[in-house]
């Protein structure tokens, strides 16, 4: 028996990258997975492809920028399945061209990022938790970022918003543990998604990797495996409010780490 058999999951922003990898991973373990997306036709093609492998993936319309859509999406899933056992809040956005340091960054962009990155977690969790209470339990996994725990010289809005995701994870965990609901967060480092690879020059990636002890860029499967760990109750039944960095050790080294390794003192 698959560990997630008869479980119903929702993964937001699931057409590619971390969201798609997480949706597939949950489906491979027996879950009925709804993929919250804007591109229904393209996602249906993905679902049809994996249906041949016996996976149950279903597209459902989700636009994180349209607040009215949130309830419609949840109502659709509840109508179809009667419950939601698992929520993976994968949606997240950035505005690097306007989200700079405190003085030079755009103020409207700062609050926009907070509204969508934290607000999407808040709104979806607020809608789904009552159903989880009725179902006597559930698991929420929020996809945050190492940027939420490590300050940057730029992107203040993104960092603060992801820090907010980390905090709301703990708030949900402590407030709803008595109902059998667990909430944890996964904090990716540099992950080889199309969005990341297309926006980062080689020089930056090389510099970033010099601060990663495991000396490789992560892949969406690394994050999906962490999501899977947090979801089934038998694997992580005593874990809630956890903030797990999946970054190859990026937050372990001192600022001198790259220079230290480069000097070949460590071989």
Swiss-Prot record:
Which Gene Ontology terms describe the biological processes this protein takes part in? bile acid catabolic process; lipid catabolic process
InterPro entries the UniProt entry points to: NAD(P)-bd_dom_sf, Sc_DH/Rdtase_CS, SDR, SDR_fam
Say yes or no: keyword Glycoprotein present.
no
At what residues does the UniProt record annotate the site feature described as Transition state stabilizer?
Answer: 145
At what residues does the UniProt record annotate the site feature described as Lowers pKa of active site Tyr? Answer: 162
The family database entries (PROSITE patterns) matched by this protein are listed as: ADH_SHORT (PS00061)
Q: Where is the active site?
A: 158 (proton acceptor)
Which terms does the record give in the GO molecular function aspect?
Answer: oxidoreductase activity
Which amino acid positions bind NADP(+), per UniProt? Answer: 13-18, 38, 63-64, 90, 158, 162, 191-195
Its induction, per UniProt? Up-regulated by bile acids, such as cholate and chenodeoxycholate. Maximally expressed during the early stationary phase of growth.
Q: Which UniProt keywords apply?
A: Bile acid catabolism, Lipid degradation, Lipid metabolism, NADP, Oxidoreductase, Steroid metabolism
- Catalysed reaction equations from the record: cholate + NADP(+) = 3alpha,12alpha-dihydroxy-7-oxo-5beta-cholanate + NADPH + H(+); chenodeoxycholate + NADP(+) = 7-oxolithocholate + NADPH + H(+)
Q: What is its EC number?
A: 1.1.1.-
- Where cholate is bound, by residue? 145, 158
Record has NADP as a keyword: yes
Q: Which SUPFAM superfamilies match?
A: NAD(P)-binding Rossmann-fold domains
Q: Name one Pfam family in it.
A: adh_short_C2
UniProt subunit comment: Homotetramer.
**Family to which the UniProt record says this protein belongs:** Belongs to the short-chain dehydrogenases/reductases (SDR) family.
**What's the stated role of this polypeptide?**
7alpha-hydroxysteroid dehydrogenase that catalyzes the NADP(+)-dependent oxidation of the 7alpha-hydroxy group of 7alpha-hydroxysteroids, such as the major human bile acids cholate and chenodeoxycholate, to the corresponding 7-oxosteroids. Is thus liley involved in the metabolism of primary bile acids.
| Annotated protein name in UniProt | 7alpha-hydroxysteroid dehydrogenase
User: From which source organism is this entry?
Assistant: Paraclostridium sordellii (Clostridium sordellii)
């Amino acid at each position: 028996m698959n560990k997630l058999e008869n479980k119903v999951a929702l993964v937001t922003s699931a057409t590619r990258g971390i969201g798609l990898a997480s949706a597939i991973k949950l489906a491979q373990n027996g879950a009925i997975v709804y993929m919250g997306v804007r591109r229904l036709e393209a996602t249906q093609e993905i679902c049809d492809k994996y249906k041949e492998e016996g996976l149950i993936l279903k597209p459902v319309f989700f636009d994180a920028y349209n607040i009215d859509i949130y309830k419609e999406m949840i109502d659709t899933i509840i109508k179809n399945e009667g419950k939601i056992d698992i929520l993976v809040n994968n949606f997240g956005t950035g505005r690097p061209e306007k989200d700079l340091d405190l003085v030079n960054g755009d103020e409207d962009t700062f609050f926009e990022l907070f509204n969508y990155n934290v607000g999407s977690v808040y709104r979806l969790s607020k809608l789904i938790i009552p159903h989880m209470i009725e179902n006597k339990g559930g698991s929420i996994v929020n996809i945050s970022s190492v940027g939420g725990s490590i300050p940057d010289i730029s992107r203040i809005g993104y960092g603060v918003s992801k820090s907010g995701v980390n905090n709301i994870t703990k708030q949900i965990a402590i407030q709803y543990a008595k109902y059998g609901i667990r909430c944890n967060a996964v904090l990716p480092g540099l992950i080889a998604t199309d969005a990341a690879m297309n926006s980062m020059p080689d020089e930056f990636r090389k510099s970033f990797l010099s601060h990663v002890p495991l000396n490789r860029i992560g892949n969406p499967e690394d994050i999906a495996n962490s999501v899977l760990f947090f979801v089934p109750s038998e694997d992580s039944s005593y874990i809630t409010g956890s903030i797990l960095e999946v970054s190859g050790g990026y937050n372990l080294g001192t600022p001198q780490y790259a220079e230290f390794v480069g000097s070949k003192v460590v071989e």
